[in-house]
Amino acid sequence: MSDLQKPELKVSVISDYICPFCFIGHKRLESLRDHYDLKINWCFVEIHPDTPPLGHDVALLNYSEDTWNSLMQNLQQLASEENITLSPQTRVTNSRKALLLAEASKQLGADVFYPLHESLFNAYFVEGQNIGDEQVLRKLAADCNLPDELIEAAWSDPYTQGPEDKTPQALLPYLQYAGAIQATSVPTFIFNKEILSGVVSKDELRQAARNMTG
């Protein structure tokens, strides 16, 4: 069935590239394309703006080794359901530059945005790269055919480097939107008036889509 024959489905998603459940949620949401002309408004919100630009060791999260290993085991089980093989998570990174880059890429259309979108998730969670590192991001952007001038424009905001309590202008509307709908976690999926948060199953997403499209 072509997109012209499918019912249109507009969904907003509040998301961050350093959230593993956002990666899993992205994969699950994409499964709706089989039945809908899916239009997603990705709303990028930093979940850890206080993380230093180049990140820090996960030990600073103050989990015990047993607790951390249990969390990772459960996470890998969820990821494997979507054919994702996670690399060992040893560092937490700052996502601000990655989010700004993805936001800027939207102006070049879905054919540029989605390869970068996927690359950012894969780089961090599958390949274990630091997507807070500018050189890593430049390489990912180049591989997705983003021109240098767009990269520079994406990072031209005075708050690109921080401080943590100042949100760049390009991302501020999303933070305000999240506050307006009282979203307290990522991912949050907005199907018109129906809001789903956290680890949402494919069945729940399908039901929300049916509710929205009648």
Model regions: which residues?
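Cys/His/Pro-rich metal-binding microdomains
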Residues: 20
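Structural alpha/beta surface segment adjacent to cysteine/selenocysteine redox centers
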Residues: 23-128
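C-terminal cap of thioredoxin/glutaredoxin-like
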Residues: 4-13, 24-36, 107-111, 115, ...
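Non-catalytic, low-structured ubiquitin/UBL-interacting segments
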Residues: 1
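Functional transmembrane helices that embed catalytic/metal-coordinating motifs
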Residues: 15-17
